[in-house]
A protein has these predicted regions:
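Class I (Rossmann-like) S-adenosyl-L-methionine-dependent methyltransferase catalytic domain
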Residues: 1-45, 49-99, 115-196
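Residue-level marker of regulatory loop/turn positions in helix-turn-helix DNA-binding domains and
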Residues: 102
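Short catalytic micro-motifs in class I SAM-dependent methyltransferases
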Residues: 108, 112
Length: 196
């Protein structure tokens, strides 16, 4: 795999302060979700970046684990989450064991992956979430572009990736999409089916 997708690429972006995926806080849809979603136990934030969302999840009562394979992202997230109970670890999402999480939170992780890893991502989400567990967050929808990351994903492809193991519960426009994603960013919640 090209280092363009490896830790060194992301280290450089963090060192140079080029983080167009960083919302600088907790997005409105996640904040609203946390007010109406009962504590589902453990929450995972893959590709956690600065970690704002991990702190919000911990503050809402989740046992939040934020992971990133970039040491610079982990250092930044540890600073931002220092006053919360969130744990931040330098780990590769695809190397996680068979832990069960009640929630996997998505923002700017799937679109940072090479499109060839999308199926691996979907299988990992299904493996990490038991029946009733939820995959919730923001998805950059649109035709797959060759000049990413970020890589948009066609809505039909996302549905095909997740439909066997998940049922979509929510799908709506984002109140304040990140400029890098524009109006194609959607808030979605998917619940793990019990029959797969």
């Amino acid at each position: 795999m090209s280092d363009f997708y490896g830790p060194q690429h992301w280290e450089t972006l963090y060192r140079e302060g080029r983080m167009p995926w960083d919302a600088g806080g907790v997005p409105a849809e996640l904040a609203a979700y946390l007010t109406r979603q009962p504590n589902a136990g453990r929450a995972l934030v893959p590709g956690c970046g600065s970690g704002y969302e991990a702190a919000a999840l911990a503050d809402a009562g989740f046992d939040a684990l934020a992971i990133d394979f970039s040491a610079a992202a982990v250092a930044r997230a540890r600073e931002i989450t220092a006053d919360s109970r969130a744990r931040v670890e330098q780990l590769d999402f695809f190397e996680l064991g068979d832990d069960d999480f009640g929630l996997v939170y998505e923002r700017a992780f799937l679109c940072a992956l090479p499109p060839a890893r999308r199926e691996d991502w979907a299988h990992a989400c299904a493996r990490l979430l038991p029946a009733g567990g939820r995959l919730a967050g923001y998805f950059f929808l649109g035709p797959t572009n060759a000049d990413g990351p970020p890589f948009a994903i066609p809505p039909d492809e996302l549905k095909a990736l997740l439909d066997d193991a998940f049922e979509r519960l929510e799908d709506r426009p984002v109140e304040a999409p990140l400029p890098v994603f524009g109006e194609t960013e959607r808030w979605q919640v998917w619940q793990r089916r019990d029959d797969t």
